[in-house]
UniProtKB/Swiss-Prot annotation:
Keyword field contains Oxidoreductase: yes
Stated name of the protein: NAD-dependent dihydropyrimidine dehydrogenase subunit PreT
Gene: preT
Lineage: Bacteria, Pseudomonadati, Pseudomonadota, Gammaproteobacteria, Enterobacterales
Binding-site residues for NAD(+), renumbered to this chain: E286
Any one GO molecular-function label of the UniProt entry: dihydropyrimidine dehydrogenase (NAD+) activity
Length: 412
């Protein structure tokens, strides 16, 4: 792979002709499996047909009907595990590149100034959302379309959550995220940044001022390991935030060792390679057949030159040297690097939601409703997958649950 820039997307975009050519490979399945496999119900089968018939506006309308973050999901979704996994075309040669087609459509939407979303009526009262990540943003759109006056309270200086603070710009450009958020604000959604529960406002205050409250705080804090408690290591989320805020203008070591095998570990490793680190190695306790990273992330990291060692877990650390033991076999492996980064998981900060009785990183809900009937939860803090598209799914479903509750249409 040629030398990359942190601000340039790794995957090239389709031109209109290439998009139509790719869409023409679609077998136009009845009850398309790809559409059944999208958690956000984005309906790839339908928008691919529209692309094939040169109806790009219709394709954009299909995507936006169920996904307020269509341009984001087009870039970061593990499509090989979701919509593309059911593509019938795979039985002929290769599945349709659904992610790049969705990216083409949403880019076309932005470039041509389409205005698919309309301002909300705000006739059904006020709803507050805590957290401006993917679940909160999607929920705000669904609630606004239903007629609610929605305000999102975000603790950071800018909205977006992990989309802004964690995902590298060569995977998700800031301009793409900014355009998605601007589209949502144009509907009439109010986003108030620098507002954190427990500091500038309380949950009880929001309950008093709104008909319902939706909690969508994410897993924004990186986890460590006791073994490295006194070592000079950096947590993955801190490294990614530092690189993102500096737009890649950070000092880079000659060699780096990343402990972990998920998508965050791949993002760290890829960022280091893109920024010029000569030797980057990821060591994960999972073996390759159970590797947690998506195939797309894994392949991208390998193409950039990242070395992957599977099936090893750290057992000792001394300075810049880490000793690993294989999870099944005997024998040890010792590696040294200028920098060690831990990518072993993330957790939520739920201390200010004690009344909702959170357990570790989860708030228990029934149909997204917490033990407090006025308070709902969605996103990473409810049980389930931790992908952006799943957060979109839960945000939309939680908004629908709020609407049913407020309108007295359910027994919850």
């Amino acid at each position: 792979m040629p030398q990359q820039n942190y601000l340039d997307e790794l995957t090239p975009a389709f031109t209109p002709l290439l998009a139509i050519k790719e869409a023409s490979r679609c077998l136009l399945c009845h009850d398309a499996p790809c559409s059944q496999a999208c958690p956000a119900q984005t309906d790839p089968g339908k928008f691919i047909r529209s692309i094939y018939f040169r109806n790009f506006k219709g394709a954009a309308e299909t995507i936006r009907e169920n996904n307020a973050l269509g341009a984001v999901c087009a870039r970061v979704c593990p499509t090989e595990k979701l919509c593309q996994s059911g593509c019938t075309r795979a039985g002929v040669d290769a599945p349709i590149d659904i992610g790049r087609l969705q990216r083409f459509v949403t880019d076309f939407e932005q470039q041509t100034g389409m205005e698919i979303y309309q301002p909300g009526t705000k006739t059904l009262g006020k709803v507050a959302i805590i957290g401006a990540g993917p679940a909160g943003l999607q929920a705000s759109v669904t609630l606004t379309n239903q007629g609610y006056d929605v305000t999102i309270y975000e603790k950071e200086a800018h909205p977006g959550g992990w989309l802004r603070n964690g995902i590298p710009q060569f995977r998700l450009p800031q301009s793409v995220l900014d355009a998605e958020i601007a589209r949502i604000e144009k509907m009439g959604v109010t986003i108030k940044c620098n507002n954190e529960i427990g500091k500038t406002l309380t949950l009880e205050q929001l309950k008093a001022e709104n008909r319902a409250v939706l909690v969508t705080v994410g897993l924004s804090s990186g986890s460590g390991l006791p073994l490295f408690e006194h070592s000079d290591v950096e947590i993955a989320v801190d490294f990614l935030l530092r690189a993102r805020q500096a737009q890649g203008d950070i000092s880079i070591p000659q060699s780096a060792l990343i402990i972990g095998g998920g998508d965050v570990a791949m993002d760290v490793a890829s960022t280091l390679k893109v920024l010029g680190c000569q030797a980057v190695t990821c060591v994960a306790r999972e073996e390759l057949d159970e590797f947690p990273a998506s195939e797309k992330e894994f392949a991208s990291a390998r193409e950039l030159g990242v070395s992957i060692i599977d099936g090893f877990t750290p057992v000792a650390v001394e300075g810049n040297k880490v000793t690993f033991k294989h999870v099944r076999l005997s024998g040890e492996l010792t590696m040294a690097a200028d920098k060690i980064i831990l990518a072993v998981g993330q957790h939520a900060r739920l201390d200010d939601f004690a009344k909702l009785e959170p357990q570790r990183n989860t708030i228990k809900t029934q149909n997204y409703q917490t033990r407090d009937p006025q308070v709902f939860a969605a996103g990473d803090i409810v049980e389930g997958d931790k992908t952006v598209v799943y957060a979109v799914k839960t945000g939309k479903e939680a908004a629908e649950a709020i609407h049913h509750y407020l309108e007295g249409a359910c027994s919850c």
